[in-house]
């Protein structure tokens, strides 16, 4: 079943694994595993501050403490001047836990959308370098500058190229609402508490990886097929992308000749755990 030509996305919901295939080669992997997921936002509590290694350990509700390096803490000055023991702090997971190591977290929150990435604590506007037209870059920057609140930052994603002002505005409003919900929850909850979790694997993969070069999306459940079709239709991307339900007897990853790579990744994770 392996296709050496087309660019496709393979979503094995049964295994919580997805792969982006470009010109017959796996270009990217998405894996949904464990209780702590990349992109999670937590209301955490500072437990230990270690100036000698310029880091702090924060409680995010897991059996392993979150690791917060000084460079990932907003503001100027020494780490011990910015953080205090038992302090409540909003952090985001930038690296999932591996083996005996807990998650790495940051206070520089980023919320990805379809066309934009909201950076609530980092003012400014940055446009993807993959958008090469100076005119289009200026147009997008002007639109975002008019729409965004003062004090927040926005990254304009490659997918924003050619999009209307209304579509960009809608995306920004969704992200701002998410951030407002995070702040409201942080004010009312006690740490450790999960404040926000990014969309499920299927939605995330389509949002992050699906573009005008995608020719096919292969899924392994009828439910996933229906969801993908609905998402593409809502995003007006359903005309050029073929959505296929795999019905073979062997697992989808095996049929697509991707399973060997997942085994290698699992072995590497075990090595990291033992190291």
Q: Model-derived features: where do they sit?
A:
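DE-rich acidic low-complexity regions and acidic surface loops
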Residues: 1-275
């Amino acid at each position: 079943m392996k296709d050496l030509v087309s660019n496709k996305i393979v979503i094995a919901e049964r295994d919580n694994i997805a792969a982006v295939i470009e010109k017959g080669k796996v270009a990217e992997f998405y894996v949904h595993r464990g209780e702590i997921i990349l992109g999670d936002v937590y209301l955490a509590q500072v437990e230990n501050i270690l100036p000698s290694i310029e880091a702090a350990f924060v409680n995010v509700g897991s059996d392993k403490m979150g690791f917060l390096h000084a460079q990932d803490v907003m503001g100027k000055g020494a780490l011990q001047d910015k953080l205090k023991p038992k302090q409540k702090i909003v952090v985001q997971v930038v690296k999932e836990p591996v083996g005996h190591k807990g998650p790495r977290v940051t206070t520089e929150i980023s919320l990805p959308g379809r066309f934009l990435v909201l950076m609530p604590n980092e003012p400014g506007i940055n446009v993807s370098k993959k958008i090469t037209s100076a005119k289009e870059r200026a147009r997008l920057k002007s639109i975002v500058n008019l729409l965004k609140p003062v004090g927040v930052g926005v990254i304009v994603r490659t997918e924003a190229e050619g999009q209307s002002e209304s579509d960009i505005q809608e995306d920004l409003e969704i992200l701002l609402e998410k951030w407002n919900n995070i702040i409201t929850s942080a004010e009312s909850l006690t740490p450790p508490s999960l404040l926000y979790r990014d969309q499920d694997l299927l939605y995330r993969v389509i949002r992050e990886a699906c573009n005008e070069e995608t020719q096919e999306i292969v899924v392994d459940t009828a439910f996933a097929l229906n969801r993908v079709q609905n998402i593409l239709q809502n995003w007006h991307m359903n005309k050029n992308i073929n959505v296929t339900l795999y019905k073979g007897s062997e697992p989808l990853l095996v049929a697509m000749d991707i399973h060997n790579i997942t085994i290698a990744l699992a072995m590497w994770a075990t090595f990291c755990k033992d190291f």
